[in-house]
């Protein structure tokens, strides 16, 4: 009898929201009491969904926050009640509907909620499939147990992925640190000459390290979060499995579907065999090339371009830059107008000369050809302005016709134009050039007395691309630039650059 009374008292001091004994109870003007944390959370939901209106979760009577009062009397009852020990059978928890006050005995399959018999007859659950909690609890217990095993397996996989990414991160750090040490050691021998190269290489490695470690750190964080998420889900399921039937069934279908549809996110990794590996250059060869380039650069002249009436190239206002355009020749016939591209060779249409003639001495200049897929440059004995449609076709690019040039076509094919053979005198002998590093800037050196024209790959430490010897300079020669069909401009570099 006394135990029954205690159960009734316990029911009276149970929070209608969390269904636990009241903690720091607060009473509303309507007389209902709630845990401080529960009614505060209810405040937030009311503010979010009901535009500031607050109402009692039990009777729906509106109230103002300032009217909420701590209920010390109820708090004292709860403290005394916690000291009383009930027998297991008498202590069985009886849960009631917060809306209707009736016992929660049914489970709504559509909403995954434990409800009372009045809820079942309400509009909210009308037509839904409802079962006694005892009928479905075992079924969902098995489903949750299966989901728990699946989740534990995925947790093991997640932990392995986390460990793998940590190991790879450490490996990358060691590898890149090792590479940086090697780079510094290799460049120490020629510090004065290769300072800029070492700095560039280290910057690349730093950037590589930054990018890779940043990506791996991000992946590591994601793996940690993923593992933590698994732990939280497992903890939630374990709590459900150890709790009451109502706790087990509340939202159970959604949790099971979320676990079944869950896929582990794999971290982004990098393949070490695909990365750029540093190779120490031929330091002696680089030193020789550097000395040669340093020597010819003493003869750097400030070259500008000379506009003419033959070329269809576009020359910039500063006379240092030239780009191509598609020329049009318009033919007028009685009553008609036809416009179509020029029939002249496109190479000819875009070739221009430097304004400075070379008749003696040594002369050097550099041309920026970065991002171009086609170009021709070198020296020329000057245009032969006869007719626009029969001059400087491709066969004209021969030393015997006054052209000492090299060129690029299709972005990767570097060639030098030599004199044609006796069998094909009107066609140049085009010799492929082996260029390991594509030049963004090409240096041209003319030694008039020695009758040589040399081309240097400035991008590759001044590597000699090609050298014409025994050139027959019978008259003044000029710098020659031809942007060809590529619309990206060619630019003459100033000596100060």
From Swiss-Prot:
This protein's record includes keyword Ligase: no
GO molecular function, one term: pattern recognition receptor activity
Chief location bin: cytoplasm
One Pfam family from the record: SPRY
Enzyme Commission identifier(s): 2.3.2.27
Subcellular location: Cytoplasm; Nucleus
Coiled-coil portions: 137-225
First and last residue of the signal peptide: none
Pathway: Protein modification; protein ubiquitination
Residue list for modification Phosphoserine: 87
Reaction(s) catalysed by this chain's protein: S-ubiquitinyl-[E2 ubiquitin-conjugating enzyme]-L-cysteine + [acceptor protein]-L-lysine = [E2 ubiquitin-conjugating enzyme]-L-cysteine + N(6)-ubiquitinyl-[acceptor protein]-L-lysine
Record-annotated B30.2/SPRY domain positions: 283-497
Record's subunit section: Can form homodimers and homotrimers. In addition to lower-order dimerization, also exhibits a higher-order multimerization and both low- and high-order multimerizations are essential for its restriction activity. Interacts with BTBD1 and BTBD2. Interacts with PSMC4, PSMC5, PSMD7 and HSPA8/HSC70. Interacts (via B30.2/SPRY domain) with HSPA1A/B. Interacts with PSMC2, MAP3K7/TAK1, TAB2 and TAB3. Interacts with SQSTM1. Interacts with TRIM6 and TRIM34. Interacts with ULK1 (phosphorylated form), GABARAP, GABARAPL1, GABARAPL2, MAP1LC3A, MAP1LC3C and BECN1.
Function: Capsid-specific restriction factor that prevents infection from non-host-adapted retroviruses. Blocks viral replication early in the life cycle, after viral entry but before reverse transcription. In addition to acting as a capsid-specific restriction factor, also acts as a pattern recognition receptor that activates innate immune signaling in response to the retroviral capsid lattice.
Domains as described in the record: The B box-type zinc finger domain and the coiled-coil domain contribute to the higher and low order multimerization respectively which is essential for restriction activity. The coiled coil domain is important for higher order multimerization by promoting the initial dimerization. The B30.2/SPRY domain acts as a capsid recognition domain. Polymorphisms in this domain explain the observed species-specific differences among orthologs.
Family: Belongs to the TRIM/RBCC family.
Protein name (database record): Tripartite motif-containing protein 5
Gene assigned in the entry: TRIM5
